[in-house]
């Protein structure tokens, strides 16, 4: 650490405990503030990574063949928390993060498939832009397959969560799902409505009832 950063760190530690109003040390602290190297402070703040940087870094770990499963899952968890923010979820397309995320649905490790479905569900929930992206990447068939046939129950549940989030109030996604559902899920001639929450709940509950 250079001398400017050292001075900044020392000042921040000294000022972490406020002095009493009539404490003579107060004068010293106020003077130290005046002497603070503002350039060092700017460098410290500018070095903080943006959410976009953190998202890309997390997905790089997820996609790294040499990363441990533990580190991949930690990265996935961090990624999921970041995309709870609507703007971050919408930036996934610009950052090129949808491709590796959808690919992770086919990972051999169940925990990775689960986290991929979880992240998709978080990204598309009440988010038309992300719902459109999911359609662009043709992920609805894969999610339905996981929901119906994955041998891991936790993967099935997260896939159902992702489907549920994808189709609510998004008619194109629901139309895509309806085309793929077995005949006993939809009445002949029925046109499901993406705004009909009860009907969507019924579909999701039926998927949950499929035996493992």
UniProtKB/Swiss-Prot annotation:
GO terms for cellular component: endoplasmic reticulum. It comes from the Eukaryota. InterPro entries: ARM-like, ARM-type_fold, Hsp70_NEF-Inhibitors, Nucleotide_exch_fac_Fes1. It is found in: Cytoplasm. One of its GO terms (molecular function) is adenyl-nucleotide exchange factor activity. Its main location: cytoplasm. One of its GO terms (biological process) is regulation of translation. ARM repeats lie at residues 26-67, 86-125, 128-168. Keywords: Cytoplasm, Repeat, Translation regulation. Belongs to the FES1 family. Functions as a nucleotide exchange factor (NEF) for Hsp70 chaperones which accelerates the release of ADP. Required for fully efficient Hsp70-mediated folding of proteins. This is Hsp70 nucleotide exchange factor FES1. It comes from Coccidioides immitis (strain RS). The gene is FES1.
């Amino acid at each position: 650490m250079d001398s400017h950063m050292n001075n900044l760190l020392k000042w921040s530690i000294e000022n972490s405990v406020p002095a009493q109003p009539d404490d003579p040390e107060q004068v010293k602290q106020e003077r130290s503030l005046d002497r603070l190297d503002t350039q060092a402070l700017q460098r410290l703040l500018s070095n903080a990574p943006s959410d976009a940087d953190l998202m890309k870094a997390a997905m790089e770990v997820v996609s790294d063949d040499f990363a441990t499963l533990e580190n991949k899952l930690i990265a996935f968890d961090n990624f999921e928390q970041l995309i709870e923010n609507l703007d971050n979820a919408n930036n996934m397309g610009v950052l090129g993060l949808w491709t590796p995320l959808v690919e992770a649905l086919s990972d051999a490790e169940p925990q990775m498939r689960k986290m991929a479905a979880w992240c998709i569900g978080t990204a598309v929930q009440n988010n038309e832009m992300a719902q459109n992206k999911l359609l662009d990447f043709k992920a609805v068939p894969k999610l339905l397959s996981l929901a119906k046939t994955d041998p891991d129950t936790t993967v099935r549940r997260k896939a159902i969560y992702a489907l549920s989030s994808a189709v609510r109030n998004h008619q194109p996604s629901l139309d895509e799902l309806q085309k793929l559902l077995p005949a006993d899920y939809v009445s002949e001639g029925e046109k499901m409505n993406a705004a009909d929450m009860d009907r969507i709940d019924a579909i999701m509950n039926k998927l949950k009832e499929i035996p493992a």
